[in-house]
């Protein structure tokens, strides 16, 4: 009888082992993204988290590559002052972003981030807050190989137009 109970308990523990999709929040990849966001805000982001073969989808089905993505990051700082990122409402803001990393056993690691991006246009003078969602697919080398950004780019496009008009 004791052996039967031991076998049952052992089977229970083995059966509870997670072998499917696993979601984590304070893991190496999620923390690497938080560090990259801090570098972005400090204007020291160097793209070291990205693979040189990066496919960057910014609200588009047509990707841009690594060099263009680096230029896009720089353009944001050329067009906006006082850039910040936050997750939460009102006084409950406690994180730069809400980030989770999911391990799909047959697909790989995917991270997702949600935050509110805020900045003041250098040409319009308008302060905007834009909800953002970004998905990241990690390669086997620990670098991001695909990035999908989802946000309303209306104000960004208008700010680009104002900057071009000012340059004429």
Question: Which residues are covered by each model-predicted region?
Answer:
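C-terminal motif of bacterial Sec signal peptides marking the signal peptidase cleavage site
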Residues: 12-15
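Positively charged n-region of N-terminal signal peptides that target proteins for export
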Residues: 1-4
